[in-house]
Amino acid sequence: MEDNLPVNVREYQELAKKALPKMAYDYINGGAEDEHTLRENIAAYTRIILRPRVLVDVSKIDMSTTLLGYTMRSPIIVAPTGGHKLAHPEGEKATARAAASCNAIMVLSFSSSCKIEDVASSCNAIRFYQLYVYKNRNVSATLVRRAESCGFKALLLTVDTPMLGRREADIRNKMVFPRSGNLEGLMTIDDHDTTNGSQLERFARATLDPSLSWKDIEWLKSITSMPIFLKGIVTAEDARRAVEAGVAGVIVSNHGARQLDYAPATIAALEEVVRAVAGAVPVLVDGGIRRGTDVFKALALGARAVMXXXPVFFGLAARGEAGARHVIEMLNGELEVAMALCGCRSVGEITRSHVMTEGDRIRSLL
């Protein structure tokens, strides 16, 4: 065991900031415009209070949960984010091995800096694939077929990006993204000129389809047998519409606060979505997870599992595969302690009564 290992995600973030070029760090840690939602994604968790129960035999803690019939060691999933080679030469292959060693599901981003096939062959594990629907539907269909043939078990369709949000740090830094081998031969985009902004902006303008609508869910279902989650749901209205569309699950997400500033923090939107879905499909949540207690709070508010991207990226940047693995292990360890101290022997015993939200406190004063 190395001396002076980081003991929390914040310390890994500090190491990552030192290790990464400014452009790469700002990309993974930045948000849209004023970054209000970026700050709120984390701050909103701090305003939820835990309500521990005592005198419970917690000598055995079971953090395992299931999703789509697959058993996970804990309800922590590695969320999709592109460009892991910004953090480490082995990119997503190193992240995939770290997740597999923790029996955690990894979601591979469409903009992975490693090919789908290379990540799939890097280790045996349950993996999901994140997708956009492009103007050229054949590109999306090809990526779906490749993921399916490589054994990916589900699709996460990102639905909050008809166009790219204004990520001012990326514009200022003239962000250049690692080439994604997944798109070789599928599209040719002249995105090298960053004179008037980031490479990501040019790519998004050329490829993302602003006409994407609910009818495209039917199209996607028609070309794959993989279950489909919609990623980017923050309202009850869209949650109910998603259930009506026949998707396998919804993910409460604001795209890491990179799209619409002043959108709700995801943990603040979670309970609204959970109530709207009413148990019809599992609800996941991402954004702002920095502690095991954050995971506990999300589960108490109805999430089946949480997704964390930035913490794992920080670990990868700081210490490679070992760092990414350690971050997942730390979050698992913190969750185990939180469960024990709140009197919960399994994730099924984590209930709404274990937390008090801002809304609860206000209602108690009325």
Curated annotation (Swiss-Prot):
Q: Which UniProt keywords apply?
A: Fatty acid metabolism, Flavoprotein, FMN, Lipid metabolism, Oxidoreductase, Peroxisome
Q: Which domain of life is it from?
A: Eukaryota
What GO molecular function annotation could you give as one example from this UniProt entry? (S)-2-hydroxy-acid oxidase activity
Q: Which parts of the sequence form the motif Microbody targeting signal?
A: 364-366
Binding-site residues, a 2-oxocarboxylate = Y27, Y132, R167, R258
Active site (catalytic residues): H255 (proton acceptor)
Question: Which residue ranges does the record assign to the FMN hydroxy acid dehydrogenase domain?
Answer: 1-360
Q: Which is one Gene Ontology cellular component term of this protein?
A: peroxisome
CDD domains this protein is in?
alpha_hydroxyacid_oxid_FMN (cd02809)
Which reactions appear under catalytic activity for this entry?
A: a (2S)-2-hydroxycarboxylate + O2 = a 2-oxocarboxylate + H2O2
EC number(s) on file: 1.1.3.15
GO BP term, example = symbiont entry into host cell
The record's listing under Pfam families reads: FMN_dh
Q: Which InterPro entries match?
A: Aldolase_TIM, Alpha-hydoxy_acid_DH_FMN, FMN-dep_DH, FMN_HAD, FMN_hydac_DH_AS
Q: What class of enzyme is it?
A: oxidoreductase
> Where is this protein localized, as stated in its record?
Peroxisome
Q: Where does FMN bind?
A: 80-82, 109, 130-132, 158, 231, 253, 286-290, 309-310
Q: Name the cofactor(s) required for activity, per the record.
A: FMN
- What is the annotated quaternary arrangement, including any partners? Homotetramer.
Q: Which family does it belong to?
A: Belongs to the FMN-dependent alpha-hydroxy acid dehydrogenase family.
Please give the function described in this protein's UniProt entry: Oxidase that catalyzes the oxidation of a broad range of 2-hydroxyacids to the corresponding 2-oxoacids, with a reduction of O2 to H2O2. May be involved in a general medium- and long-chain fatty acid catabolic pathway such as alpha-oxidation.
This chain belongs to the protein called: Peroxisomal (S)-2-hydroxy-acid oxidase GLO4
Naturally occurring in which organism (per UniProt): Oryza sativa subsp. indica
Taxonomic lineage of the native organism: Eukaryota, Viridiplantae, Streptophyta, Embryophyta, Tracheophyta
